[in-house]
Each structure stands twice: as C-alpha cells, then as structure tokens.
C-alpha cells in the first residue's frame, strides 16, 4: 500500500497538498505508506532548510503539521532525500504516484512517465502536461480536495492495466519516437512555415480553449495588431477559473 512523491520540496511543486491529504488516506487505509523522494535543495544546493532539514522553514511549517504527531514524523511517512536511479527500485514497490499535486509550472511532467513505467497509477492535477503524459486520466482532478479520495481508490483497486500503460509510454515517449518528433519540429521551424505545431490540435483540443488559441496563433502571424489583444489564458484565469473556484469551494 505504498504511495510515492518524487520532486522538489518547494511551494511550486505542491507537496503540501499531498501532506494535507495524508491523514484522510490513513483513515481509510491504515497501512498506507508515503515515500517522499526529493528535497528543498534539489534545484539549489545552497538553499537554507528548516528545522526538519527537508524544505524551506516557511514551507515546512505549512505541511509538516499534517504529517507529524507529538513533534515526530508519522511512522507512515518516509523522507528519503534526493535519490538517483535507485528511486526506480522504490517506485516498483509503489501502487500510486503523485507528481506535483498542484500542477503548477508543469509543461510536460516527466516524473509521471517515470512513475507509470515502474507500475504506479497516477493521480495529480488536471493540467496541460499531465493530459498528454498520464494514461488513465480519470484520476486527474481540478480540485485538490479530491486527492485523498483518488489515492484511496487507487490503493484499494484490484486490477491494473500495466500492459496498456507500458504500450502507451512506448508508443508516445520512447527514444525513437521523440527523436523523430524533434527532427520534425526543427524542420517545421524554418522561416516561412505557418505553424510550428500544425498537428497539435489533435490532442485535447477543448482543454483551456486550445482550438481557439491555435486559431488565433495562425491569425497573429498574418495580422500583427491581434498581438495587442489579451490572451485566451488571461480571459480564463480572470473569469472561468474564478467561477470554478467558487463552485469547488462552496
């Protein structure tokens, strides 16, 4: 009943969301174990860590209160620091992987690929990168309040489509596949080409109004004055996202 988090322990990577969900997971799955691979020093070895030597003091204070008791880390939580390839041995023993629960700053999310290739089921924020890299999308959430519920379901489920997941990764993210896509990108980036990604509309066209964004991208090549207009993402962040937040937090 193991759960894994792999990543930097900084606010942008959202570990605090997983920590706050952990007590609810334990309430339903008492033998669940959380393995945390990473550190506040992952990307900056000169960072000053807090009391627990895990993350920045302010960030530690935000998440440690959820996973400590009597000033001791819960027995079910294991901080392993920064690991190399040996983390794969750990992931092979985990049922659930939770990469960046906040989804912030993610454009691809390679950790999700690593976790799935080792047999982990994924639950995390429904955002651009993970829509492409996560095979089973029904456990991607808009609201982090669903994180604990998703972890519990994945820990308790009896069946897992390992073969389909592995085929998905091999077909979409193998070395041979990615090298050809880079070659295609460089060729299409030559001067005079209308779009760098004319085929990208095929994937998740309605997410964040992607089909409109790509349509405008083509028009902006022809009509420069359109570059002065607010972006579609700006519109979403200042209208639709706020509506969703109020609905989810009622």
Show which residues each predicted segment covers.
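Conserved donor-binding/catalytic core segment of Leloir-type glycosyltransferases
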Residues: 1-13, 19-23, 34-37
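Nucleotide-activated donor-binding/catalytic signature segment of Leloir-type glycosyltransferases, i.e.
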Residues: 47-82
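Short acidic alpha-helix that forms the nucleotide-activated donor recognition element
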Residues: 64-69, 84-94, 117
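Acidic donor-binding loop of glycosyltransferase active sites
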Residues: 92-107
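Short glycine/serine-rich donor-binding loops of glycosyltransferases
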Residues: 109-112
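Short hydrophobic beta-strand element within catalytic cores of glycosyltransferases
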Residues: 117-124
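C-terminal amphipathic helix plus adjacent low-complexity
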Residues: 166-250
